[in-house]
């Protein structure tokens, strides 16, 4: 039997008690959930905003300022590409690592664009990871998104 573990992005993992090294030693591979284009659970922006809400429960008016602060200190206040690369680089050597890339998002949310999928695939490969896992309801992803993820379709289409 093979055992794999979904882990939050490296910046979130310590905050939820996930130790990449310890968990990686128990699994055949780990899958960092590096979802930067979808606003769904485990998505980078979704989780960061949830943290801001959690620390603002006693003072809801402070939510917007805390959200902006968390985005600034994590580097997620602009282009997520650089942040994504930093998170890939922050993954400690733990055996087999297979990053998760979202191909689809939840119903009612904007789709993940093929150019974004291609960009994520490119950045994962540039970081030295040549395996990847297609995430977020792959059965609902369109064929072109799957082809882009697999490296079959061009990177310049949407």
Where in this protein do the model-derived segments appear?
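A solvent-exposed, charged loop/short amphipathic helix patch at secondary-structure junctions
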Residues: 45-74
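Short beta-strand/loop segments at the ligand-binding rim of alpha/beta enzyme cores
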Residues: 1-8, 93-99
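Helix N-terminus capping/helix-initiation residues
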Residues: 19, 59-62, 113, 142
């Amino acid at each position: 039997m093979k055992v794999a573990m979904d882990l939050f992005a490296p910046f979130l993992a310590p905050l939820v008690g996930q130790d990449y090294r310890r968990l990686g030693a128990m699994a055949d591979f780990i899958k960092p959930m590096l979802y930067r284009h979808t606003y769904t659970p485990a998505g980078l922006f979704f989780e960061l905003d949830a943290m801001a809400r959690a620390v603002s429960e006693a003072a809801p008016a402070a939510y917007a300022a805390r959200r902006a602060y968390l985005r600034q200190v994590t580097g997620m206040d602009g282009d997520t590409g650089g942040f994504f690369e930093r998170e890939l680089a922050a993954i400690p050597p733990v055996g087999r690592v297979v990053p998760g890339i979202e191909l689809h998002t939840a119903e009612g949310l904007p789709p993940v664009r093929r150019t974004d999928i291609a960009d994520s695939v490119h950045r994962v490969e540039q970081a030295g990871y040549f395996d990847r896992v297609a995430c977020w309801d792959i059965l609902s992803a369109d064929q072109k998104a799957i082809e882009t993820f697999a490296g079959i379709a061009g990177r310049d289409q949407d």
